[in-house]
Amino acid sequence: MAKVEQNEGLVEKLVAVDRVAKVVKGGRIFSFTALTVVGDGNGRVGFGRGKAREVPAAISKALEAARRNMITVDLAGTTLQHPVNARHGASRVYMQPASEGTGVIAGGAMRAVLEAAGVHNVLAKCYGSTNAANVVNATFKGLRDMTSPEKVAAKRGLSVEQIQG
């Protein structure tokens, strides 16, 4: 499902390619949409969508959009900081940190995002719609909203020990 390439230090993953149709008076005009994920494997990850009459053109547009749309994720080593819930449309995702050696336990589109971000140990589940675009969006929302204890402590004016109890 996910095609992987290495380019300029970034991991590029092809998550989905769909054929779409525009209906006109003379029939249907087919084009392709591509959904890609790009990451450096060290906390920076982005996703993009591209649309074109040919598959390779759609993929290159999607990769370019993904490189422009990168975010930085606060990771705790090779896992997440804390459990995260997020949703986009009818897709809901739940991700929780896992101990070393667990691996990436996640389905399809979520797996591509987490691996590109550099998360090596995580337990994740997708509920509701499994539409790849919505799952990727929900996963991004969850990763973007995740905060480290250091940032929470700084925001509250407390020490990390007081935050973690």
From Swiss-Prot:
- Where in this chain does the record put each S5 DRBM domain? 10-73
Q: A Pfam family this protein belongs to?
A: Ribosomal_S5
Cited SUPFAM superfamilies: dsRNA-binding domain-like, Ribosomal protein S5 domain 2-like
Lineage: superkingdom: Bacteria
One GO CC term, this protein: small ribosomal subunit
Q: Which UniProt keywords apply?
A: Ribonucleoprotein, Ribosomal protein, RNA-binding, rRNA-binding
- UniProt keyword annotation of Ribosomal protein present: yes
One term of GO molecular function: rRNA binding
Could you provide one GO biological process annotation from this protein's UniProt record?
translation
Q: Member of which family?
A: Belongs to the universal ribosomal protein uS5 family.
Subunit structure as annotated in this protein's UniProt entry: Part of the 30S ribosomal subunit. Contacts proteins S4 and S8.
| Reported function | With S4 and S12 plays an important role in translational accuracy. Located at the back of the 30S subunit body where it stabilizes the conformation of the head with respect to the body.
Record comment regarding domains: The N-terminal domain interacts with the head of the 30S subunit; the C-terminal domain interacts with the body and contacts protein S4. The interaction surface between S4 and S5 is involved in control of translational fidelity.
Kindly give the PANTHER family that the UniProt entry links to this protein.
Answer: MITOCHONDRIAL RIBOSOMAL PROTEIN S5
Supply the name of the protein: Small ribosomal subunit protein uS5
Record the organism. Acinetobacter baylyi (strain ATCC 33305 / BD413 / ADP1)
Coding gene?
Answer: rpsE
